[in-house]
Amino acid sequence: GEIVRIRDESTYRGVPEPRIHTKLNDFPSYGEQMIKFCEEIGFTLMPWQQWLAHHTLKYKPDGRWCHPVVTLLCSRQQGKSTFMALQILFRIYVLEEKLQVHTAHKLTTSAELFYKIYGIIEQNPRLAAEFTKKLESKGFQELQFTKGRRYIVRANNSAGRGIAAPETIHLDEAREYKDEDVWSALRYTQMASANPQIWVYSNAGDQHSIVLNKLRERAMAAIFGGNDDIGWFEWSAPIGIKFDNSPAFWLGVCQANPSLGITVHPD
């Protein structure tokens, strides 16, 4: 977690490894395959995104995910949504998952990602070759692919309705969920999934962020030796950091902003 200075004293690089994370393991990972897939479709993952892909896409000898629940916590404008879009595409095209469901607190947020994914597919002949249909109605969007693969966006108030056995669920803006209704509904849909994984994306929450806070409690217990296979990956500054331009301050900035010096400017 040290600051990497480049070019001159005023230029800093974000720290690729999260300040807080659950225990790492040596199981095999699809991370390299995701990094390679992204390169092939014109995207180079940033160091922190590569680190995240490597440690979250690990699987056990029986093929099941090491972390059935993964939380990515970092500040805004770091590349969370780009990572999510690329991961969704990787799961469609490389892992060939049959169903992924995506919901966010605001439908506009998930709709934005839907169009981002659709745009990437349209611009890439290799991806477009396996794409078959785009469906849209109020509170619902879907992309369909060959071999019965689907990616669905749902408004959060109907996120779990009529959906059976998605392999992966992507829950965005987790800090905004003040109760567990949507979380419970989504988890219920995965009961028949052979190898489910739920991804939770957020920036820092507050005391009302019920879903995020419960996951963080689980993660902290796991970090201190509890028996829980949750994955928690948090890029943040230490609590109580002073805004004083000191080395400690800048280390905190680098820890909270993994894209600093790449896509984010120190200002």
Regions found by a protein language model. Give the residues of each.
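Phosphate/NTP-binding elements of NTP-utilizing enzymes
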Residues: G1-D267
